[in-house]
């Protein structure tokens, strides 16, 4: 097994960070390096990350050049523009960092750049689902405390966006009713089993795309995440 953990462009508070084209190129370059210098089975390349790493995982799925077997995004960010409003309303430090990474001036968000850096607004490469899997994992309590800063609606809206771009049947979507129940009840909506030692609150799957909500916060269940990638 070859494990690479590139730093990309550092903390997400500069114009070159926050899933810029340079970050996407860094991900591709890191994989290229591993292929050249490691004993790599190119049919078994995986990308995973938590939080900002989950954001990068979604960006990699949308734009990276390699044929990846599986992407797993844990508690990811998908919409930088909307997250600015969410973090500003909650007076979290991230709102100031978003201004920095979007070249914003005078405390006003440069929305054009924020959208450019948001997978939510990118074209979906639907053909990738012919050979790649994308799983999104969401802690049901995320977005409720300062140390759990990304609302679950970020993942829900991105999941539904992919379905829309794939012209999926309406039954595949997470409905507004389910979204409201997840936000209100913060507990399993049925018997969906467990991941690791956590109850699954809700799960949805369409072809090679899946989303799982579990009892937890802004976290990755590391052993489960590794084992699931290796399947």
Predicted regions and their residues:
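Mobile cap/lid helix-loop segments that gate and shape the active-site cleft of serine hydrolases
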Residues: 69-70, 76-77, 81-128, 181-193
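C-terminal catalytic histidine-bearing segment of alpha/beta-hydrolase fold enzymes
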Residues: 137, 143-146, 153-231
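Conserved alpha/beta-hydrolase
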Residues: 1-13
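Active-site loop signature of alpha/beta-hydrolase-fold enzymes
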Residues: 9-11, 79, 219
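Short, solvent-exposed loop/turn and secondary-structure capping segments
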Residues: 15-18, 59-60, 82-86, 146-152, ...
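Primarily recognizes the serine-hydrolase "nucleophile elbow" in alpha/beta-hydrolase
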Residues: 33-92
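Short, proline-enriched alpha-helix->beta-strand connector loops that line the catalytic pocket
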Residues: 117, 127-134, 205-209
């Amino acid at each position: 097994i070859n494990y690479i953990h590139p730093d990309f462009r550092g903390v997400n508070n500069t114009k070159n960070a926050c899933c810029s084209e340079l970050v996407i190129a860094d991900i591709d370059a890191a994989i290229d390096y591993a292929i050249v210098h490691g004993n790599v089975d190119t049919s078994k390349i995986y990308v995973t990350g938590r939080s900002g790493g989950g954001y990068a995982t979604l960006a990699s799925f949308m734009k990276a050049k390699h044929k990846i077997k599986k992407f797993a995004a844990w508690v990811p960010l998908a919409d930088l523009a909307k997250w600015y409003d969410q973090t500003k309303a909650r007076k979290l430090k991230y709102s100031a960092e978003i201004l920095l990474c979007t070249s914003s001036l005078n405390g006003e968000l440069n929305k054009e750049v924020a959208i450019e850096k948001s997978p939510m607004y990118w074209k979906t490469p639907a053909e990738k689902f012919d050979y790649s899997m994308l799983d999104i994992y969401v802690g049901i309590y995320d977005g409720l405390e300062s140390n759990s800063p990304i609302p679950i609606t970020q993942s829900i809206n991105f999941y539904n966006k992919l379905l829309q771009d794939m012209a999926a049947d309406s039954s595949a979507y997470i409905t507004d009713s389910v979204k409201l129940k997840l936000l209100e009840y913060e507990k399993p909506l049925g018997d969906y089993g467990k991941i690791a030692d956590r109850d699954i609150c809700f799960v949805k799957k369409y072809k090679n795309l899946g989303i799982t909500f579990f009892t937890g916060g802004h976290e990755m269940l590391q052993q489960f995440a590794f084992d699931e990638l290796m399947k």
